[in-house]
Amino acid sequence: MQNQNGKASGLLPLFLFVCLFVGSGLITGDFYSLPIVAAALAASVVSLAMNRKEKLSQKTEWFAKGAGHPDIMIMVMIFILAGAFSSAAKAMGAVESTVNLALSFVPGQFMVAGLFIIAAFISVSVGTSTGTIAALAPIAAGISAEIGVPAAYSVAAVVGGAMFGDNLSFISDTTIAAVRTQKTKMSDKFKTNFLIVLPAAVATVILLMVFSAGGHPGAQAGTYSWVKVLPYLGVLIFALLGFNVMAVIFGGIVLAGVIGISDGSLTLHTYLTAITEGIGGMSELIILSLLIGGMAEMMKRNGGIAFLLQFVSRRIRSKKGAEAGIAGLVSAANLATANNTIAIITAGPLAKDLSDRYGIDNRKSASILDIFSCAVQGLIPYGAQMLSAAQIAKISPISILPYSFYPILIGVCGICAIIFRLPRFTEKA
């Protein structure tokens, strides 16, 4: 990648996409005024129209390769299952019962902070932020109405907790990619990474409790049924035990159907209809993921990604500058690809060269890659995490940004770790 000639023009599709999506929202005051899929489609067409030296058939194959990247396909499968589970669980009363159960035991001012902590534990266990969001976002949206806080606020807590696990889990794609590209041990990277982001997690919990104090801590809980809570309870328990997230969500779909049909709240027809409607509700998100994946591949082929990497690497003059450069490399790659795993794989080899050249500990370089990729991924409104959370909660992804405490704070902690050269290693890995 670093040997490819970089071209700033290769980033034109990304620039167009952001301008259309964000610009139209700022101008009209409504971020739904221009459907995000329309912006992505326009940018994708531009990416295919560029580089006239190549045949359209070849460029179409490249686009399809990007759209069909394993990371994209896994996300699509999770989105399909998440839509089906969310709709089926809601139809048989699981969401309402789960919200009322939570309100019965947890004071309102601690509820959102609790969502962050639960999301963090689940994400660490299953290694996927999107799966965690799929399981918890419906509950977060339901709780927000009961305790008097914006849905974007409670959903942002779930996204933040999910990014905590995405960054630290031993089975997360981002962790594996960072460890492999930097040639360090998983346990060593975890310890280093954890020390850097722990203050961000603690500060996030405190902020969530402070901001929740303005809600309605005395919200009255309605009636609930333990049986109806089982689909969500089962998903949470088996996710925490580390089972495959797709298998866990599929099990939740089946359990919701069995309970709903058994107690009469669903018939086979209404159950299957709910599943179909849930999957259909995710269609926009699925299409968007495919378009962004294809567009990212075209930007790579057109030299846009290489331009970003070269632009950052040329400005490095010191060890501290090299660490900042690694952070900049992976952040830029993440902005362009909207996928933190792909961003780490893209920037990883050059980051390894920089760490070797300037004597950066491999544990630190791996942590920087993972921290900044997760910080950016948790903030971009066109990333899978924000989009899926917004889709489930029926809100704009832009509305989640002001409450995205954790992604912002891990970025701040990462910058502090670079400036103050933390943590200080007593022995070489």
Predicted regions, residues:
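Hydrophobic alpha-helical transmembrane segments of multi-pass integral membrane proteins
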Residues: V76-F85, F105-I139, V312-L350, L369
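Membrane-interfacial loop-to-helix junctions in multi-pass transporters
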Residues: H69-M75, N100-I118, S144-S154, L198, ...
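Core transmembrane alpha-helical segments of multi-pass membrane transporters/permeases
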Residues: V37, A49, K59-G93, Q109, ...
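Juxtamembrane and boundary regions of transmembrane helices in multi-pass small-molecule transporters
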Residues: I27, F31, G160-M163, N167-T223, ...
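Alpha-helical transmembrane segments of multi-pass membrane proteins
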Residues: I78, Q109-I122, G148-G165, G321-N334, ...
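Re-entrant/interfacial helical elements at transmembrane boundaries that shape
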Residues: G131-G142, V159, F170-T184, F307-L308, ...
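Juxtamembrane helix-boundary/capping and inter-helix hinge elements in multi-pass membrane proteins
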Residues: Q2, R52-K55, G68-I72, G148-A152, ...
